[in-house]
Amino acid sequence: MANPFSRWFLSERPPNCHVADLETSLDPHQTLLKVQKYKPALSDWVHYIFLGSIMLFVFITNPAPWIFKILFYCFLGTLFIIPATSQFFFNALPILTWVALYFTSSYFPDDRRPPITVKVLPAVETILYGDNLSDILATSTNSFLDILAWLPYGLFHFGAPFVVAAILFVFGPPTVLQGYAFAFGYMNLFGVIMQNVFPAAPPWYKILYGLQSANYDMHGSPGGLARIDKLLGINMYTTAFSNSSVIFGAFPSLHSGCATMEALFFCYCFPKLKPLFIAYVCWLWWSTMYLTHHYFVDLMAGSVLSYVIFQYTKYTHLPIVDTSLFCRWSYTSIEKYDISKSDPLAADSNDIESVPLSNLELDFDLNMTDEPSVSPSLFDGSTSVSRSSATSITSLGVKRA
């Protein structure tokens, strides 16, 4: 009798198909052989050099003891070289790089950081949308709305990436999880870089300090999440946000970026549920403004960043989804997008411009001077009758016979 896993997930698996199989070997020699045969493209060189440079920067900048940093990097190297673990952790390199840079950001010297902007975001918000949407949404608060905003912002945001990864791994096509790790990691990595290059105060700062200048010695604030701490009798969010690694990281909103990226991947793999995923993103947008953690312009920037990275990932990394298949073990092959075929401006053999002139039928054009005109003309004498309207003939001064 088949076990539940085989009955549910392997029943559609084609015989002798190993597309969805996982690597179970613990022999590092196999990884070394793959590396020797690997021929990286230009994009691969850029990818690894960029991430490697940031990891080296973190290694030098982070104030942790050198022995701990060396041991940590050796541990990562071990995970990368063992086949059973490298298939997950090696593809998660953008995520690991983002996490390393994020937790190192608080140790950057203040004299080398750019000044914190306090007035730009509320000014842009007013110019684009006519008012400060965060202030409007946060004007009226109650316990029900607090809980409703806390769920996506304070709970789902931290657990959703793992849930989405698990669902994509089981019900998406093989290798889709690699694309998700690539896109999710790069979106957050670019977001943290932008937050460090362009530090901006969130709405809660304006509520507490007005428009006075900010400095890096200030502590963060949980904003509306302080009401959740009070409601639940805890001090979790107050402590976490007061000591955040990137206190002035309002722009772009990585809460919005993460929710948008998760929704984009779910819409890609499960298009029938697209309204549900869009509703989740809108729910999180509202919660971030209600809890005074972001302006609407921050949310738009985070979503645009996610969309751009997703589109690049879609055409360079993601497999094509077959919505008629149940799970990863139902696939018989992995197909990816061909950018040249998807380009609407690319030359096509079916285009009329691509057909040689020798293959065109030119009999009509060649015989135009030898045969009388089929269409009546004004200058064919009394036998010609114009096919245009009577008004146009009259305007030429020609009377009908």
UniProtKB/Swiss-Prot annotation:
Pfam families the record matches: PAP2_3 (PF14378)
Entry's Gene Ontology cellular component terms: endoplasmic reticulum; Golgi apparatus; Golgi cisterna membrane; inositol phosphoceramide synthase complex
Residue ranges annotated as Lumenal topological domain: 63-64, 109-155, 200-245, 290-291
Residues carrying Phosphoserine: 392, 395
Disulfide bridge positions per record: none
Consequence recorded when altering residue 158 to Y: In AUR1-1; AbA resistant
Topology relative to the membrane: Multi-pass membrane protein
Sorted UniProt keywords: Glycoprotein, Golgi apparatus, Lipid metabolism, Membrane, Phosphoprotein, Sphingolipid metabolism, Transferase, Transmembrane, Transmembrane helix
SMART domains, sorted: acidPPc (SM00014)
InterPro entries in alphabetical order: Aur1/Ipt1, IPC_Synthase-Related, P_Acid_Pase_2/haloperoxi_sf, P_Acid_Pase_2/haloperoxidase
Composition bias, Low complexity: 382-395
Activity regulation summary: Inhibited by aureobasidin A (AbA), khafrefungin and rustmicin.
Cytoplasmic-facing ranges: 1-41, 86-87, 177-178, 267-268, 313-401
Region of interest (Disordered), residue spans: 374-401
Membrane-crossing segments per the record: 42-62, 65-85, 88-108, 156-176, 179-199, 246-266, 269-289, 292-312
Subunit structure: Component of the inositol phosphorylceramide synthase complex composed of at least AUR1 and KEI1.
Function: Catalytic component of the inositol phosphorylceramide synthase which catalyzes the addition of a phosphorylinositol group onto ceramide to form inositol phosphorylceramide, an essential step in sphingolipid biosynthesis.
Name the UniProt record assigns to this protein: Inositol phosphorylceramide synthase catalytic subunit AUR1
